[in-house]
Amino acid sequence: MNVNELILDKVRSLIFTDLADGSVIGRLTKLEEPSLQTAAEGEDITDAQGALITKLFRAKTGKFTANNSLFSVDLLALQYGADKELASESDKIIVPIEEILTVENGKITLSHMPSSEIRHIYKLESGQLATKYTLGAAASETEFSISDQEITVPTGITGKIYVEYEYESANAVRVKNSAEKFPEAVGVKIFAIFKDMCNENVKYAGTIVARRGKIDSSAIETALTGTGKHSFSIDFMKDYCDDSVDGADLFSVIIAE
């Protein structure tokens, strides 16, 4: 097979792999505006009159950039150099929550069991925080009391109450952004689909393989909107510990039927 000009149908997915065992540690499937870039430093070699004899290039670099259509927790963890923590029954995650609850018979019931003491609740008026009430041993005109998930509001209070608290969850995910942790080197494979230019029913599988890559953490922007994209950039690197010919590879482009 000796293919040349093809139609790039789409970049199907991208995976990040652990350098130690090759396991997949992240996968993206909604890639937009993918771009593969290479660059090198050039130096002009001239004669005594300044005429160009040749040009030498060195320090070649490779980079892949794209936007993921959806917010990705896997990508966020890789960008922050963090682990994706999964909660369980034996290792729960503390989750902050806010609730707006309607007073019924002088009480409100929280959706979750608080993991720590709730010291304040707030009366809402026109959707805004109006009056702050403090925890007491028993409900009074200025204090509320709490038993498990049930709060007895101050005497005579009706309407909406705002409560902010924390609870333990066995069904949660957490990614921490530490000031002292940065992205680690990973393997990268980008899977694409090509079509024959003369017969679009003939398809080819394309793969971009980088043995070593690192997510660029110099500037990470995560759009916190429904229509925002999760952008990222990966720098490809040669393997300095591999003295073979393949060790100098930044990446390979492979196309097969």
Annotate each predicted stretch with a short phrase.
Residues M1-Q79, K132, G206, A210-S231:
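Solvent-exposed edge beta-strands and adjacent loop segments
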Residues D74-E141, E166-G187, I193-Y204:
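Extended beta-strand solenoid/passenger and fiber regions
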Residues F57-A59, I100-E104, S140-D148, L224-G226:
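Short, ordered beta-strand-loop transition motifs
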Residues N68-S72, Y167-S169, A192-C198, R212-A219, ...:
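Beta-strand elements of well-folded, non-transmembrane domains
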Residues V24, L28, A39-G42, A139, ...:
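Conserved short "hinge" loops at termini or chain/domain junctions
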Residues K63-N67, Y162-E164, K189-F191, S231-D235:
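Beta-strand secondary-structure signal
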Residues S126-G127, E143-D148, V153-G156, Y204-E257:
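Mixed-charge, glycine-accented linear interaction segment located at domain edges/termini
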Residues R58-K63, V153-Y162:
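Extracellular interaction modules
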